Amino acid sequence: MSENTFLVEIGTEELPPKALRSLAESFAANVTAELDNAGLAHGKVEWFAAPRRLALKVANLAAAQADREVEKRGPAIAQAFDAEGKPSKAAEGWARGCGITVDQAERLTTDKGEWLLYRAHVKGESTEALLPNMIASSLAKLPIPKLMRWGASDVHFVRPVHTVTLLLGDKVIPATILGIPSDRVIRGHRFMGEPEFTIDHADQYPQILLERGKVIADYEQRKAKIKADAQEAARKIGGQADLSESLLEEVTSLVEWPVVLTAKFEEKFLAVPSEALVYTMKGDQKYFPVYDNAGKLLPNFIFVANIESKDPQQIISGNEKVVRPRLADAEFFFNTDRKKRLEDNLPRLETVLFQQQLGTLRDKTDRIQALAGWIAEQIGADVNHATRAGLLSKCDLMTNMVFEFTDTQGVMGMHYARHDGEAEDVAVALNEQYQPRFAGDALPSNPVACAVAIADKMDTLAGIFGIGQHPKGDKDPFALRRAALGVLRIIVEKNLDLDLQTLTEEAVRLYGEKLTNANVVDDVIDFMLGRFRAWYQDEGYGVDTIQAVLARRPTRPADFDARMKAVSHFRTLEESSALAAANKRVSNILAKSDETLNDIVHASVLKEAAEIKLAGNLVVLRDKLQPYFAAGRYQDALIELAALREPVDEFFENVMVNAEDKDVRINRLTLLSKLRELFLQVADISLLQ
């Protein structure tokens, strides 16, 4: 066995399942950084995580830091001694800091002078001496939002700690971590294997824990086993398990010895919308639903036990008994809610505040209704259906089902609207009004749904900015960043002809006198353009490309996107660098001039061949490109403008812009301003690097 394998395991009470992976990864990253900063050579750092433990295993860890030579330069000789050759206070202070006397110092001579010099051979500290503080420091830096204190001690950690194992090879490293003395004792599964045992060597981990403790400490191995076993269990009943990544991660963090089992529920519950059943199975019980090959929910579910029982049927029956009342509740709520129309919930919206200064949910509903109709008119959607969907948009929030199962908002509105005989695009809009809910989420599928989704988000943006409660730092209680990005994605990806200026003005107008921020329209637009910056950076666009387009402040998102793609393509052209530099030069020249320019370039004042050539090219391109600009064909326009490289280069090589003759000078400045105006029709390419 290798004598330089290092193991640390922190044995705790059950750790927060949703934080387990991040805790383990952060622990590994922190320890790796500590080792690197200390100059300790090491091999692979592996992390392990289970509900009651965090562990790291470091391969090939050096026994000590490498020895090193230390040099510390002192004062120059001229300042180190007085006229009588006695050491100055500066020299004596420096020597004390080095642990020597001045006469023990060496001298360093260079072409710039002579200095006192201290040289020392520093022996590296042993790894054994360094590790305790490294581990303590790494644990203290873990991302723990809320610490616990237990017993009578002042020790704080995410959960109470029971064991600390620190092994370097076969040797226990003496230390007290989180109030617990280090040892070689490890605790196994609560109900299987050995409850407690000793580990002789770091290399035995995690195999010894698997064999004697019945714990799979390897997180990824445990996760892969759950996934494979669940897929196989679903296949056996002719279905496919819904193994969403977030739930799979959570279940992996809840069990030490996963045993996958299959259970069932009564088929009568399938009459309830599947979303409600799935919500309670996944959200409350941490079960995996099962669907047939057509995507229809089956009356089965898969769950993961944390014990290998001699009578698994008893565990299965227990879980079936647990889930049945929840499904029965969903069935009851569904049947009760359908006894009245969705629209009948409108008066109850008056009892729920949207925001104290902005009114109730009924007030918000009225604004969404009006704004959705206005948007529908702009994008060619059915105005009547959009206003109807806007009116019903929040009614399902007052139903029993959504009150009990909050994540079913929207989707239950869709089911109840269908039951009431509403138009299909109205029903779908009630579900899709919240889309996209997160990055990469699906967008609303029809124009009516797009209108309602945009209206809902714009109403929130206008209202919250209108009372001066915009996001600050990482605090965004009204999810305004998500709302803004959602609006932009819908408009761009659905290619809707909407202008943020008029859209925001309409959203603000519907608030009447409630808003107090006089600059609300500009604030909302600036905020949304800022979301564009983050979006396109995530898409891989260069910051300077984004800046070039933002400089024009285009307020039509689809138009903004077209400009981004055009500038990105322009950068691939051979002429782009020269023209970007030329535009920067033109911008600087014009900025330094305070003279009033002409409205047009006067051909009669042009003298040099190069300026005549450039002016001629600009006239031709101006006429040719106007239809391109009007149609948003920015990429084609920039390809045409790339042909200006040669005449622009010739102009700067052969023409003196700041001529002594005022008329000639102003005419040349006007010519350059017309050149810049053409490029600015697309973007400010002078900002390209």
From Swiss-Prot:
Top-level EC class as recorded in UniProt: ligase
Protein name, UniProt field: Glycine--tRNA ligase beta subunit
Source organism of this protein record: Klebsiella pneumoniae subsp. pneumoniae (strain ATCC 700721 / MGH 78578)
Chief place of localization: cytoplasm
GO cellular component: cytosol
Gene Ontology BP term (one): arginyl-tRNA aminoacylation
Keywords annotated in UniProt: Aminoacyl-tRNA synthetase, ATP-binding, Cytoplasm, Ligase, Nucleotide-binding, Protein biosynthesis
InterPro entries named in the record: DALR_anticod-bd (IPR008909), Gly-tRNA-synth_bsu (IPR015944), Gly-tRNA-synth_heterodimer (IPR006194)
SUPFAM superfamilies cross-referenced by the UniProt entry: HD-domain/PDEase-like (SSF109604)
Family: Belongs to the class-II aminoacyl-tRNA synthetase family.
Localisation per UniProt entry: Cytoplasm
Highest taxon, organism lineage: Bacteria
Chain's gene name: glyS
Subunit annotation: Tetramer of two alpha and two beta subunits.
GO molecular function: arginine-tRNA ligase activity; ATP binding; glycine-tRNA ligase activity
Record field: catalytic activity: tRNA(Gly) + glycine + ATP = glycyl-tRNA(Gly) + AMP + diphosphate
EC number assigned by the record: 6.1.1.14
